[in-house]
Amino acid sequence: ILTDSGGFQVFSLAKLRNIKEEGVYFNSHIDGRKIFMGPEESMRIQSNLASTIAMAFDECVENPSPYEYTKNSVERTTRWLKRCVTEMKRLNSLDDTINKNQMLFGINQGGIYDDLLRKIKSDILWESELP
């Protein structure tokens, strides 16, 4: 079973969200209440679902998006990936974790920009230490 991080779902709430370094604040489309989702929250939800593969929390940008915005998004997504790795390692060390062998996959972002697509691929492969 593969679970998604919620990044695309947050993207789909563009008019209701506010992206920050710590994560994303958004208003429920159902009742308007404020909700926060960050890398750690995403990992905890996916761990509780006991999927085989969990996806790292990422920022999905519109197509097309300006280069600078996309670059900042790629850098934030890489930082979020590192936080996902840290949280997954912590969760997998707990006695009550259901699936201690859950795998974490990074998501390749970068919009339409080849250099950014290559950069995040390199970050995912070499800098994140995926479990």
Language-model region placement:
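Non-catalytic, usually N-terminal nucleic-acid engagement modules in DNA/RNA processing proteins
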Residues: 1-98
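Glycine-rich phosphate/ribose-binding loops and adjacent secondary-structure elements
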Residues: 75-78, 84-95, 99-131
